[in-house]
Amino acid sequence: MQASNWMTPRERVRAYFRAGRPVHLPVDPTGPGPGEAFPFALLPGDPERVERIAAHLENPRIIGRNREFTVAVGTYRGCGVTVCSTGIGGPSTEIAVLELAALGVHTLIRTGGTGALDARIPPGSLIINHAMMRDSGPVDAYAPPTYPAAAHPEVVAALTAAAEELGFAYTCGIGATTASYYQGQGRAILPGGDEHLARFRHLGIINLEMEAATLLALASLLGLRAGVVLGVHINRALDRWDDAYEATQDKVIRVALEAVRRLGRGGAAASKTAGGTSRRV
């Protein structure tokens, strides 16, 4: 079946499914899985992270594994949650977002790690990006370079409120998604690599990663809600690493799931508590 002009974007993705199944995600649409029953998706990069997130859910179930994609479902305080790994980078993230959208997922939150560029952001804290700079990637096939990669305000509000409630330090700001881990993030292999990092800092970019802009831009184009919460595992300005990687990732997971709970009950507005420490830069 080929996509037609009268179809919605989600229907067009489904038109490319094989025998009703996604081309890449290990999901059987005829059984319980991503969609109406589990419409909130958490998107870690690492497939091994899926089981760690699933451990926080009620009645978790691994749906399947295929290449970089591991998919699980469960519930969190009454909200149906899908967990789907994306692998590293934009192309595999594009696949995950489009196929989840075609299955009926309506809210997606990237959970993972990042490197901070601002010396004021400590390793082990969290970053909630309200927008990302697109530094090339698969979104270029869908929209011009001027099209923004912005998080949905309801998801940003839910994430910040969750971090406040849990008492976790976090920073809000604009990050950058790169298509290159080494040269593109200033880990110079060839001459000129250092210029990338200087450019990001000049623009006020607070962190670098490789998937979020693809998620945010595609979600906007598809009419979905999306957001980003990341653990800071290195501060590039200080060359200081996070000594508690797993504990930081657990904070990311807890914030994302509490945000899902808030979004699921329709109460995404940030509540003021005495817990978290926030900074906008």
Write out the residue ranges for each language-model feature.
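Metabolite-binding pocket within alpha/beta catalytic cores that recognizes anionic/polar moieties
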Residues: 2-158
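Generic non-transmembrane alpha-helical segments
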Residues: 158-166, 218, 255-263
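His/Asp/Glu-rich mid-to-C-terminal helical/loop segments that flank catalytic regions of hydrolases
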Residues: 236-281
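Flexible, glycine/charged-enriched surface loops at secondary-structure junctions
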Residues: 59-65, 167-174, 265-281
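Short acidic/polar active-site loop segments enriched in Thr and Asp
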Residues: 106-107, 206, 225
